[in-house]
């Protein structure tokens, strides 16, 4: 399991400054000095808790070093900084990288880890895969995708076609050292209508079976539709089903797990996440840790179709949750810096349109006119469904 198997045995050395002895620190086994850097060895599956603890103690994390690895600088995870009444600070515009690597000239990434995200009792298998891209020119932004070219050939002896996957890490990578890119990949499987045979997706199966050290051909990045708004005071509404969570994990890490000098999020992020079972909530611990640490800036709403019911007794899909909150969402959409991002199954779209049509009508508006003439025209409605 992600954060529970291979990663659990990995240790990281934290360098922390600014700690002070308090009643709380005296209850721990840590020897707290009143000045200088202090170092802590922390297992991977306790990193979130440890960073929250350091924040409570008033400290600042200045680097993380994988034991037997290299130093990866990391700022402290603290409450989003107040703006002290100043005008909103806009993130410096960056060039959007596109097709740095093409299918005829891919770069080579090396697998660092490949870990299961679905917990016991869940459906299917989904892996969080981290690739080492150091030594390449690959760079990317939150909301983009990369292409993967599976090894081997198809039935006709030709190379397999590439498949695109949404990136699940920020531009700085999971270790925040600008040397990795991460994916969230579900192994595709379906029944052949004629034979009943189970068919597995070529690329998703290839990725799910990779081992640390394996080399993979990577292309891209591609995509401009899902780029995260650079307004640190924006309202960001995210609608995800299944592995559609990938770009939103990147968004949330950028908002809450990194302390970028040019982007300190002070707005509202609201994630609606639809899954079949609780065991299928991908990155559950991460999401709930962020919610606990930033309750004023992050809202988390699950739609668990096999476990939750709508008021009329039906299964609770994500569109049902949108219907419950449609009036509030409508009001949020009147703000010029509210963006909606949708990623996952296309089947959620009609129900969301229906819910928002009803909410708009209560306010004397036509949802389709508002959607096309305002949200899409202003670049505030972002959709990547399949």
From Swiss-Prot:
Q: SUPFAM superfamilies from the entry?
A: Ferredoxin reductase-like, C-terminal NADP-linked domain, Riboflavin synthase domain-like
What keywords would UniProt list here?
Antenna complex, FAD, Flavoprotein, Membrane, NADP, Oxidoreductase, Phycobilisome, Thylakoid
- Keyword NAD annotated: no
- Organism superkingdom: Bacteria
Membrane topology category: Peripheral membrane protein
Similarity remark: Belongs to the ferredoxin--NADP reductase type 1 family.
What protein is this chain from? Ferredoxin--NADP reductase
Per the UniProt record, the source organism is Thermosynechococcus vestitus (strain NIES-2133 / IAM M-273 / BP-1)
Question: What lineage does UniProt assign to this protein's organism?
Answer: Bacteria, Bacillati, Cyanobacteriota, Cyanophyceae, Acaryochloridales
């Amino acid at each position: 399991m992600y954060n529970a198997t291979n990663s659990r045995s990995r240790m990281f050395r934290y360098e922390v400054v600014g700690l002070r002895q308090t009643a709380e620190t005296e209850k721990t086994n840590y020897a707290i000095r009143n000045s200088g850097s202090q170092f802590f060895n922390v297992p991977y599956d306790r990193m979130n808790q440890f960073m929250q603890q350091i924040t409570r103690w008033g400290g600042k994390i200045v680097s993380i070093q994988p034991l037997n690895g290299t130093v990866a600088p990391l700022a402290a995870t603290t409450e989003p900084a107040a703006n002290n009444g100043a005008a909103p600070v806009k993130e410096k515009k960056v060039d959007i990288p596109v097709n740095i690597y093409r299918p005829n000239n891919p770069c080579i990434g090396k697998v660092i880890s490949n870990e299961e995200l679905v917990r016991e009792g869940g459906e299917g298998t989904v892996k969080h895969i981290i690739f080492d891209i150091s030594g390449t020119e690959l760079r990317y932004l939150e909301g983009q995708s990369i292409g993967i070219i599976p090894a081997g050939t198809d039935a006709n002896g030709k190379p397999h076609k590439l498949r695109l996957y949404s990136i699940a890490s920020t531009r700085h990578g999971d270790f925040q050292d600008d040397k990795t890119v991460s994916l969230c990949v579900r192994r595709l499987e379906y029944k052949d209508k004629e034979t009943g045979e189970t068919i597995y997706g070529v690329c998703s199966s290839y990725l799910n079976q990779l081992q640390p050290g394996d080399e993979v051909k990577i292309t891209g990045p591609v995509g401009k539709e899902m780029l995260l708004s650079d307004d640190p005071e924006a309202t960001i509404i995210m609608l995800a089903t299944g592995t559609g969570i990938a770009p939103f994990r990147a968004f949330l890490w950028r908002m809450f797990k990194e302390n970028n000098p040019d982007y300190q999020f002070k707005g509202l992020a609201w994630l609606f996440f639809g899954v079949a079972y609780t065991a299928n909530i991908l990155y559950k611990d991460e999401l709930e840790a962020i919610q606990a640490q930033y309750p004023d800036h992050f809202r988390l709403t699950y739609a668990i179709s096999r476990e939750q019911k709508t008021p009329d007794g039906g299964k609770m899909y994500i569109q049902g949750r949108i219907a419950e909150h449609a009036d509030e969402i409508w009001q949020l959409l009147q703000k010029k810096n509210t963006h909606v991002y949708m990623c996952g199954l296309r089947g959620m779209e009609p129900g969301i349109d229906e819910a928002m049509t009803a909410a708009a009508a209560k306010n004397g508006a036509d949802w389709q006119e508002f959607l096309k003439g305002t949200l899409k025209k202003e670049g505030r409605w972002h959709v990547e469904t399949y």
